[in-house]
Amino acid sequence: AEVIKIERPGVGDPRRSIPPFVENNGIKKAGGFMAYNRNKKSLALNIRNDEGKNIYQDLVKNIDVVVENLRPGSVDKLGLGYHDLKNLNPRLIYAAISGFGRLEGYEGPDSKRPAFDIVAEAMSGIMHLVGFEDKPPSWTIYGMADIYTGLCTSFAIMQALFMRERTGKGQFVDSAMLDNMLSLNERMAMLYSITGNEPHRGRLTHLYPRGAFKCKDGYLAMNVPDDMVWARLCTTMGRDDLINDERSNNGTARASNAEFLAPIIEEWLSPKTRSEAETILNQNGVPVGSVYTAKDVFESKQVKSRKALVNIDDPDVGTYQFARGPVMLSGSPEIETNPAPDLGQHSYEVLSEILRYSDDKIDKLAESGTIEIKP
């Protein structure tokens, strides 16, 4: 897809000003912006003045999808919301990302509230389950709700595009961070609905071993889902006596006696490196994986074989590696990646090639401050 990012002239996306930064020959760029805006084009456009609004509306007539995640109601005040734009382009797919949803008839009392990533994690029940029972709730990873909501929104956009092929009509895509994170927390909803009980933070009441166990050089992640895998683990450790022990002969018993079993497992693991233990256990039918640091991930043969980290060559600050998209297609396993744009880098290109504006008109728009063109 050709993605055009609308940014404020002179300011740009706030992410451009958030560390960590890369500097070279007096040029400073934000790592987060570089990572999250690959393959996009930057149009620096002031949509708050009449000229800017007209340009935006002209663009809408010529594109397939609008995606925005501004505070609910802000674009409507400018006359650039879905109901305004669908009249200009009935085939338009308009995707709105918000904290709590905007679809008419389904707004709820929180629909106009702003929200950040951690708010969605908290109010979806996820934070309540992350961490340990004797500690405060914790978050998952930085940006989980942002990232997952973006993925869900992209899937929904593709659904809407497919439906448009059948109906010829566009539609409004309402993507709420709360809804997306609740769908990710489906197990909690199922457990509470079926049992009426609150799930326990940091542990399951019917499964064990499950978690990170200490080895000689780090930690090994292990999940034993049933008694068959438990028997394999016991045999591998030379502890067949634990297979039928009443303290460990089923998942519920093992979960109740985790404090008894954890030292036994770690005693077996302690003289072994992660790699050694991983090899032995996987060969014996106990799926495990090393808990990798960032350095481990970058050095992983599996990651390298999958080309899961791609080189991004920025002409100003050099080459860096970022994670590629999560899915590969056999018809196009490797997609060309371009560096994140400078502010206004594609303003002239977009206005001249898509809207067929003359050079004179573009120059006047730049002089008035309606657009910004990278020097």
Regions found by a protein language model. Name each.
Residues 208-284, 288:
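Aromatic-enriched alpha-helical interface/lid elements that frame and gate functional surfaces
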Residues 102-103, 134-144, 165-179, 199-205, ...:
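Conserved Rossmann-fold dehydrogenase catalytic segment
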Residues 128-131, 150-170, 183, 187-193, ...:
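Oxidoreductase and adenylate-handling cofactor-binding alpha/beta cores
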Residues 1-166, 342, 348-375:
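N-terminal helix-loop segment corresponding to the beta1-alpha1 unit
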Residues 24, 33, 200-205, 210-212, ...:
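Short Gly/Pro-enriched turn/cap motifs at secondary-structure boundaries
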Residues 214-215, 296-375:
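Terminal low-complexity tails and localization/encapsulation signals of metabolic enzymes
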Residues 10, 99-101, 177-182, 217, ...:
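Glycine-rich beta-alpha junction loops
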Residues 3, 282-296, 357-363:
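Short, well-structured beta-strand/strand-turn elements
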